[in-house]
From Swiss-Prot:
GO terms for molecular function: RNA binding. Belongs to the NusB family. GO terms for biological process: DNA-templated transcription termination; transcription antitermination. Pfam families: NusB (PF01029). Involved in transcription antitermination. Required for transcription of ribosomal RNA (rRNA) genes. Binds specifically to the boxA antiterminator sequence of the ribosomal RNA (rrn) operons. InterPro entries: NusB-like_sf, NusB_fam, NusB_RsmB_TIM44. This is Transcription antitermination protein NusB. Keywords: RNA-binding, Transcription, Transcription antitermination, Transcription regulation. GO terms for cellular component: cytosol. It comes from Brucella abortus (strain 2308). Coiled coil: none annotated.
Amino acid sequence: MNSIPEGRPTPNLPRTANKRGVARLAAVQALFQMDVAGTGVMEVVAEYEAFRLGKEVDGTQYLDADPQWFRAIVAGVVEDQLKLDPMIHQALTEDWPLSRLDSTLRAILRAGAWELKARKDVPTAVIVSEYVDIAKAFYTEDEPKLVNAVLDRLALVIRGESRGAKPRHKS
């Protein structure tokens, strides 16, 4: 994973994305910043809207994002985190508690879980695919597969539908 100077994760490869996709990526980066630096939700949203979304930062041009989508994800994850984390924990394998995951992976899973829960108007396949793509931008190993499996399990629990996952059974 690459980092920009402030320590925020940045994708490995540039890719085209729609405004909601860019908002999802920015939300993951903002959630990472909040987790690592202890930045508050109002501060991080204001920073991203004023200085990052659609702006040039340290020679890197940020793509235009849907600011309302960005705000909704960040604020929604913060508001629902106490409900989301136990759901994510249940969807992980028993030897991988949420606390063991790095901050970027936690941010991806929290944002994806929130969208599955709160944005019933967005198809499950779109949400899962978008967050798997975000994981692929940061990781080259098994993490994108983990994101796919966890979000698919959560979709089954939250929405009663999935892209093929089976619920995790405790032995």
